[in-house]
Regions:
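Extended, charge-enriched "interface" segments that sit outside catalytic cores
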Residues: 1-99, 376-385, 396-397, 419, ...
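Helicase-primase coupling helices
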Residues: 7-14, 23, 329, 335-421
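Electropositive phosphate-/nucleotide-binding environments in soluble metabolic enzymes
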Residues: 12, 16, 73, 77-84, ...
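Glycine-rich phosphate-binding loops that contact phosphosugars or nucleotide phosphates
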Residues: 85-92, 100-265
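Short glycine-rich or small-residue beta-strand-to-loop segments that form or flank ligand, phosphate
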Residues: 104-112, 164-170, 290-297, 334, ...
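Short, solvent-exposed amphipathic alpha-helical segments in soluble enzyme
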Residues: 121-126, 155-159, 181-183, 215, ...
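Active-site phosphate/pyrophosphate-binding segments
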Residues: 186-371, 410, 457-483
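C-terminal helical/tail subdomains of lipid-metabolizing enzymes
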Residues: 415-483
Length: 483
């Protein structure tokens, strides 16, 4: 893998025969050819008739992609520069609040891919940035339409010294606009001018694009889906403000390097595709229903939640890319928590439950802050890493005991991604690895991994409830909740 990472699948239930079969499957399914079509600008999102260009936000793997006379690589780079220039002006004090004072906090208002990915990346690098003197501004996030979410965040910040990023591609997202109004109301009550505290990340055709209510607008387009948008202005604005544009650029560099590895037709030299194919084998041949993502790094505490959206929204489909029902299982359930916390939570089921759940561990040799203590001849970081090694062997080998309550059958497959330290570059490579894994699995299953119709029905019904246009079961549940 890129950026000093390594993918180890020694504890997976695959041998040379299986690997050869998976290599044949990769060729038969034309996985690399389909990836080439994607990054060269083919319409891969067949449902919405759109290209899929998140790779282009970090590097150009193939041909120039031009839409309506606009080179999309140049467009993405221009928006990254716009975000970088804005962040630098905030950091130097060229852009200030009404009293000429520097902003110290940035709050992102968004939901789904506008929250999960950027939040996960911010948390992942917060300690690294502090240790490396690149921490510029504290970042917070408002996502849920639950008013307690916004109220709690606003109560925790100094409004006069806070910037707010409103993220909505369409400019019409109900939850985001509701929370924006919540924030504006708080700013006005504090005697502040909202337009001096807010910027937008949106599309060029959105109502937010040219509004005077914002200090600036950073643009995205229809070709980068929300769950893949951390490398666009959706992640770029807040991460550049929090850590500096140079750190965000390092994330992109790590992702770009991993993307280049993903173009290799040899599955043993393409960790993203190999991981994907082993996952397909576990899902469709072995029949395993879920995958647990287990980072032994507190900095990656929200990374499983981001991958949960990225994977399940992409490949949680029961029809193929032509709209026809499939007669095989597709995407697994994804869940996870950081270790060692998870060991004292759901690992019991993973070790001794009736379902076998494949495991994806992530571990680093060094901590980010470098602050540690030696107790009983080992540091905390050594104890953390020892637990990873122990769990992999325990899951794979188990332990026989005549007392069945203490018997561990083993045979629980796992992989591990290891690195020296979690840095911006290795974080970018890690992000790209899982994005590419999901993409390759979607190709094998012949899915459109880049739409999310499953999100829409609930939105439509919720609007009916709020308009009091209900009957039947919808009315019963509306009345139950006193709407």
């Amino acid at each position: 893998m890129a950026a000093g990472l390594a993918y180890n699948y020694a504890a997976k239930q695959v041998d040379e025969t299986v690997l050869n079969a998976l290599a044949d499957l990769a060729d038969e399914a034309q996985l690399i050819d389909k990836f080439q079509e994607l990054y060269n600008g083919a319409v891969i999102n067949t449902g919405e008739k759109r290209m899929v260009l998140h790779h282009l936000a970090r590097t150009q793997l193939g041909d120039a992609v031009v839409v309506d006379g606009v080179d999309k690589r140049e467009f993405y780079v221009a928006q990254q520069k716009k975000a970088a220039d804005f962040a630098n002006k905030v950091h130097t004090g060229e852009i200030t609040n009404e009293n000429g004072e520097k902003f110290t906090t940035v709050v992102q208002i968004g939901i789904g891919g506008s929250d999960l990915g950027p939040r996960a990346l911010y948390i992942a690098l917060e300690n690294w940035a502090k240790a490396n003197n690149t921490f510029k501004m504290e970042a917070k996030f408002i996502s849920n339409v639950d008013p307690d979410d916004a109220a709690a965040v606003l109560a925790s910040v100094d409004l006069a010294h806070s910037l707010f990023i409103v993220v909505s591609k369409s400019g019409t997202t109900l939850e985001t606009l509701t929370n924006e109004a919540f924030v504006k109301n708080a700013l006005v009550k504090a005697g502040l001018n909202p337009s001096k505290h807010m910027l937008a990340v949106t599309s060029e055709t959105s109502p937010l694009a040219k509004s005077e209510d914002y200090l600036t607008a950073i643009f995205m387009d229809d070709y980068i889906g929300g769950r893949y948008s951390s490398v666009s202005g959706v992640g770029g604005a807040i991460l550049s403000l929090a850590f500096g544009p140079e750190v965000f650029a390092q994330i992109l560099d790590g992702a770009a390097a991993e993307d280049k590895l993903a173009t290799n037709k040899n599955i043993l030299e393409n960790p993203d595709m190999l991981d994907a194919l082993i996952g397909v084998y576990e899902r469709n041949v072995q029949g395993y229903p879920a995958t647990a993502v287990l980072p032994y790094s507190q900095a990656l505490s929200r990374f499983p939640a981001h991958l949960q959206q990225c994977d399940m929204e992409s490949n949680g489909k029961s029809v193929n890319r032509f709209g026809e029902p499939v007669d095989y299982v597709t995407g697994p359930v994804i869940f996870g928590e950081p270790g060692t916390n998870g060991q004292h939570s759901f690992y019991q089921l993973l070790h001794q439950g009736t379902d076998i759940v494949p495991l994806q561990f992530i571990g680093f040799k060094k901590s980010q802050l470098g602050v540690d203590v030696d107790i009983e001849n080992s540091t905390s970081q050594q104890k953390l890493c020892a637990n990873v090694a122990a769990q992999i062997v325990a899951f794979a080998c188990g332990k026989k005991d005549e007392n069945l309550n203490k018997n561990f059958k083993g045979g629980r497959p796992s992989s591990i991604i290891t690195g020296e330290e979690l840095t911006p570059a290795s974080l970018g490579a890690l992000l790209a690895h899982f994005e590419n894994k999901i993409m390759f699995q979607g190709f094998v299953w012949n899915l459109n991994s880049f739409d999310q119709e499953g999100v829409q029905l609930g939105k439509v019904l919720a609007k009916r409830v709020l308009a009091h246009d209900t009957d039947g079961a919808l009315k019963v549940y509306s009345d139950l909740l006193n709407i």
